[in-house]
Amino acid sequence: MGVKILGTSAENVDAAEDRELFDEILEKCQIPRPKGHTVFTAEEAKKAANELGYPVLVRPSYVLGGQGMRIAVSDEDVEEYIGVINQIAQEHPILVDKYLMGKEIEVDAVCDGEDILIPGIMEHIERAGIHSGDSISVYPARTISEKAKETIAEYTRRLARALHVV
């Protein structure tokens, strides 16, 4: 059609959503992350959860806004949540990650291909992982230390560069 689409390439958006590719990027960027597994069935999910130790975060891959994300504390929870996830994203894998108690932080960043501007680091009000897509956040973050904000900003810059975010 002759129309140039500006922005991050589809390949890099896919890399951000693909568990294995994103893990490779995090490794290259030296960014820590909780242990996790990619699974396809309830049995695999329960096995992964037991290996990681409860609680775990169970969520579909390739779903925006935290839809279908649940914190599981037992095999029964995993079984129930897999049923919900399969209704939302049947053709995609399921991610089972060790749940880390803490705060959920959201970062907005703008990049022109070279310079990266981080206008805000927001702090979610609810417990991490509960309502990621519809939660309330506050800016500026109220209880995040300056050191943590600096680390978050540095990790954001590393990821923006690695993913060629534009």
Model-identified regions with their sequence ranges:
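N-terminal beta-alpha lobe that positions the nucleotide/phosphoryl donor
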Residues: 1-166
